[in-house]
Amino acid sequence: MSQAAKTAVVAWLLAAVYYFYQYTLRSAPGVMIPQLSEAFGLTALGVASLVGLFYYGYSPFSLVAGAAIDRLGAKRVIPIGAAAVGIGALLFGSGSQEAASVGRVIQGAGGVFALVGAVYIATTHFPPSRAATLIGATQMFGMSGGSAGQFVVGPLISGGMNWQLFWTTMGIVGLVISVVLYLFLPKEESARAVGHGVKDTVRAFSGVFRNPQSILCGMIAGLLFVPTTIFDMIWGVRYLQEARGFEYVDAVIRSSMIPVGWIIGCPLLGAISDRIGRRKPVIIGGAVMLLVSMAWALYGKTDLFPPYIVGIVAGIASGAAMLPYTVIKEANRPEWSGTATGVVNFLNFTFSALLGPVFGWILQSVSGGAERELSHYQMTFEPLLYGVALAIVLAMFLRETGTKGAVAGRQKPEK
């Protein structure tokens, strides 16, 4: 392995570790809703709304992150994002509802630089034939953090760890990660074929947004992500406790199986896609499997399959949501890689930002503010199934960008 290749691997691994950390903080509030409710004097719905503020920073700053990395390079930008996540964690653990709200938004704004940065490194420093595999592996790190945020943090909190101590500790960890990123990310050459002015940035955004394939990628990814970001990470534990009757620890473990499935599915589906040289069949196949498993999670019996199987299968299938990140990169100009990733991330998590409060409000309405039952959750989250079905239909309109796709069917990069 050449020195340049080793440097690229180290850079990608560091960004992936940062993504792991960010995802841990993204999912951790889901296992401490009772503690947060007591600390802030909020209902479970109020805490869910506060936690959902993450996406109000994450979604719009996807555009900022992509453009900034294209213009300035990874070394100048990614460490700032990690520092922001650390500061946001410290604010969240301050005990003040106002500071926690601001901190949650800052966590989202800083956290987006992890995925965009890691994908940027994967798509600019490695061969195109490895793109889907590396992007899937990146999400594997993220979902490992998401699983840790439930599977590891849950027992810590239930075992007596103070929730403020957790957030303070993680805030310090974020600042340390920022320093490590700054010290070890390589400085990029300034000779990349991309401009550095405002006009060039606007041109990149215009080119990516005007490409219909970009919009399709964002919508498909968003519809496939929502079952995880809203149903599992915010309401999963409560659903399993209130609607299915599981004890807290068992509910946490079962809920964390979806991120565990992502850990398997993201690199697996990415590798399959690279292996067969096609994107669409893997996206559609994964989405169909997600639709079936989510329908079973809402309406099926809990004792028919071995424990944790449904969650793991849903998570594996959800890995298909990362393939649009590869497609959008292949459907646009190479020098717009960061911008394209930012755009698909923006469109993706706009779904989570907008729909999170909506699902919370619906659940509150159908339950009448009383004790929530299985039927209430089914009525509230059934639209997620329609969303996955819509993603399957939209995927049929994607143009194949894989290496073995028909030339006539490929989307030429926007010029």
Features from the language model and the residues they span:
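Cytoplasmic membrane-interface "Motif A"-like loop-to-helix N-cap segments
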Residues: 71-82, 274-288
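Conserved MFS/SLC helix-loop-helix module at the cytosolic interface between two early adjacent transmembrane helices
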Residues: 60-98
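Extracytoplasmic gate region of multi-pass secondary transporters
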Residues: 29-30, 212-269, 352-360
